[in-house]
Structures are given as C-alpha cells and as structure tokens.
Amino acid sequence: MSDSIETAPVNTPAARRTAVGARRPFYRRRKACPFSGPNAPKIDYKDVRLLSRFLSERGKIVPSRITAVSAKKQRELARAIKRARFLALLPYVVD
C-alpha cells in the first residue's frame, strides 16, 4: 500500500506566493509626506524655492500621487502656490 500524496501544481497562486516569499514582486512602499514629521518644512507662500519643487516645468501643480504629499498638506500647498501666483512671486504659466 503506497500512500500517494498529491502536491499542488507550482503555478497556482498559493504556490507562487510561498515561492516568492509572500511578497509582491512590484510592490513599492508608499513614500512619506515631505511636510509631515519633526524636521518638515513649513508651507509658506513666500518660500518660492520650496513651492517651485511642486510645480511642473510648465508651471502646473504636480499631483499628490507623484509628490507623495498628504491630502491635507496638498490642499495647503495648492493654496500657497495660488497665493504666490496672485502676488507675482510664481508664474501662472512657463513659456
């Protein structure tokens, strides 16, 4: 009497998960918000150098999914950029 133990095929999702080490192959860890934390810079409409880091080369506000800014800080950042534009510290469009 031979007890045959069936093993699952290697190409099943469960087998692949254990073979890879239970980690997703293209998983990227979410970056932390650059304005959260102890040494984070304060968002100020007069700090043109800081605000220009969050503008595209065309002068548009870069979305938070690219810059990893939290939703609350993204609203604050957008308000500061718009205020700086109104005061002619930043351009509306770049040629």
From Swiss-Prot:
Keyword annotations from UniProtKB, A to Z: Ribonucleoprotein, Ribosomal protein, RNA-binding, rRNA-binding
Function as written in the Swiss-Prot or TrEMBL entry: Binds as a heterodimer with protein bS6 to the central domain of the 16S rRNA, where it helps stabilize the platform of the 30S subunit.
Protein name: Small ribosomal subunit protein bS18
Claim: RNA-binding is one of the keywords in the record: yes
Organism: Acidiphilium cryptum (strain JF-5)
Pfam families: Ribosomal_S18
SUPFAM superfamilies associated with the record: Ribosomal protein S18
Gene Ontology annotations of biological process type: translation
